[in-house]
Amino acid sequence: MTNVLNLLNEIGIEELRPPQKKVIEEGLLDKSKNFLICIPTASGKTLIGEMALLNHVLDENYNLTGKKGLFIVPLKALASEKFDEFQKKYETYGIKVGMSIGDYDTKEDLSKYNIIITTSEKLDSLMRHNIEWIKDLSLAVIDEIHLIGDNERGGTLEVILTKLKNINAQIVGLSATVGNPEEIANWLNAKLVTDEWRPVELKKGIYLENEINYINNQDSQKKSFKAVKSISRNNLTDLIVDSVNEKGSCLIFCNSKRNAVGESKKHNLTKYLSKAELNDLNSISEEILSILETPTETCKSLSECIKKGVAFHHAGLTYQHRKAVEEGFRNKVIKVICCTPTLSAGLNLPCRRAIIRDIRRYSQNGLIDIPKLEIHQCIGRAGRPGLDPYGEGIILAKNEKDVEKAFLALTGPLENIYSKLSNQKVLRVHILGLIATLEIKSTSELINFIKNTFYAHQYGNLHGVLTNVSKVVEFLEKNKFIETLDDDFTPKKNRVLELTLDNSNNLVLDSKRRMDTLTNLSFKPTNLGKRVSELYIDPLSSEIIIEGLNELKEKINDMDRSNIDQYIFYIISKATEMRPLLRVKMDEELELIQEMDKLKISDYSIENIEAFKNSKMFLDWINETPEEVILEKYGIEPGILRYKVDQARWMTYSSKEIAKLVKLNNDKIYKALLEMEFRIEYGAKEELIELLKIKNIGRVRARRLFNIGIKSKMDILKNPEKIISTFGDKVGKKILDEFGLKYGQQKLSGF
């Protein structure tokens, strides 16, 4: 303990905050104890995780122990942030900090690192490659552990935690918002530590008709009020200006990307800002326009908003645009960000006033209330330690009925978190992963693993999940991902596919036989199963790809290259990883069906028509249709396009790997997959591939170079003046710098 506290003192942390002291007193530095720590945002959760990490990787004399600690975060951006922070703090002490957030089909050598920062999905994929260093793992810190209840990602986090429990690593879970912390702590066999202390007071209130009605944190019946001066026709503008005039900043949480953009356009803060602030805003505005080779309408809208002191932030922006907005806000240049609640998922963007504009949002089932857990995550961003005297979490009410709902959202208990493990896609991916890595070799081991999950702990009765497990195992066997071996029974009888449990949760294959008499029932992964597990894709997607490529093989001799490309995109667009697909409007349907006919596609289900529309978008992308045209034609944002392109690149690579394994024996298909993987990454035709391998040259610049006769690296070296004249000094010099070539030199240094 002394070494940890002394080291913190050396890096400038002289006194721990009350929750941090409390956790130490409760035994955090006892490596045999698991912890679930539920304390407010900004109260020091990350440092608690750091203390646990230091306790494992350093001994009393600051020598490295050889043990490793994981810091698991929900977002790649957050991983990058923590990586930079931890490196600066701890490399002086010989602690090597590593980060793994890249492609799933990689076996990075992380053995030299003492602290490894990653996401749950990346960790899961690493484990499928039988990493050696896992034997040295003695601690896992899980940030935002409440995401175990997330519909999309919760199942993976639950499986990871179950694996970590099985290898007896210390587990430290961190969260600000858990409705049922006792239940999760019991499952983890963890000490639960809760605390309400915050470094900055958080005032919660409801805003209606230019008045904030504050709710007393100790007594919700006691209320205080603040009148907000009316200076515009928009009472939300009034609330923003009220904060800006007090040197505060605002996050406004909206229920959709469209509303976040629309809201940001309504506010103009220029007359409340200094000349220096306006100059800084103009600089960020110009930076936004220079990020992409050709600015899109979204770029232009964001740039214009930023000039006025306001920005929007959502998944539709590219990573570079989001980063620029975040930095501008942290540096107190951008005063307001209108965003979706995804911004609250762990990013370090505190503000003076967090405003919930909408307490309801649209879902597949219509308009629903936003969960209280999510609202509390959002308002927890309010209050910057050392910068703000207090923080405010305010819900905007439109009428008295909204006031009642807002009051319940601010004062009512948080929702419980529920396991998402019973989802069939989650089970397909993870049961195959467990069998492929030989972690699970028999029916009994599979049942024991399931018994150790949060699902089993929460529901007790496993009959529901076992029904889905049975279906998944049947699917995996039928499609040759696994083999089941049973020496006592014929393959058709009493198979693992007929899993049931008795009242004591013992496996029963029929009314007379129990699991303990069937130890010879075992699983074995096939080569296909192993590879699909390593690729980290849904086995159902693999089956779709195999079936689709075999269909293409029958048709390929009647197709030109463009049709082959589109058919491959159609196949991968049907994969589960590609959802949600582009929606098909009623007036598009007939035309799309007619185009499908030309490729001899006869299944006109809505999912297939949507997949075909997706294939058209990807074909436009690799044929160099301008990005702005694609965005308008398909009604999507730049960030969503980049995400879909990245997913398509991964599925194209996976298709190529699967095609090799199943011996498709068709050179045309394999060649198309090989070229498409690179083309889709850059969105260009084959002739530009060599130029695209050069840093600072994207598809637009590559096409401009090709059109003036610059087609290779050697052409660039021979014609540096053409590079400068085509792109100007700034961009041209960046390109030439990649070769060590300064403008005016006639040869390349060190080439």
Swiss-Prot record:
SUPFAM superfamilies recorded: P-loop containing nucleoside triphosphate hydrolases (SSF52540), Sec63 N-terminal domain-like (SSF158702), Winged helix' DNA-binding domain (SSF46785)
GO biological process: DNA repair
Residue ranges of domain Helicase ATP-binding in the record: 26-196
Binding residues annotated for ATP, in chain numbering: Q20, I39, P40, T41, A42, S43, G44, K45, T46
UniProt short sequence motif DEAH box, positions renumbered to this chain: 143-146
Keywords: ATP-binding, DNA damage, DNA repair, DNA-binding, Helicase, Hydrolase, Isomerase, Nucleotide-binding
Keyword Nucleotide-binding attached: yes
GO MF entries: 3'-5' DNA helicase activity; ATP binding; ATP hydrolysis activity; DNA binding
Enzyme class label: isomerase
InterPro entries linked: DEAD/DEAH_box_helicase_dom, Hel308-like_dom4, Hel308_SKI2-like, Helicase_ATP-bd, Helicase_C-like, Helicase_Hel308, HTH_61, P-loop_NTPase
Reaction equation(s) it catalyzes: Couples ATP hydrolysis with the unwinding of duplex DNA by translocating in the 3'-5' direction; ATP + H2O = ADP + phosphate + H(+)
Cited Pfam families: DEAD, Helicase_C, Helicase_dom4_arc, HTH_61
EC number: 5.6.2.4
Annotated ranges, domain Helicase C-terminal: 235-435
Family: Belongs to the helicase family. Hel308 subfamily.
Subunit and interaction comment: Monomer.
Functional description taken from the UniProt entry: DNA-dependent ATPase and 3'-5' DNA helicase that may be involved in repair of stalled replication forks.
Record's protein name: ATP-dependent DNA helicase Hel308
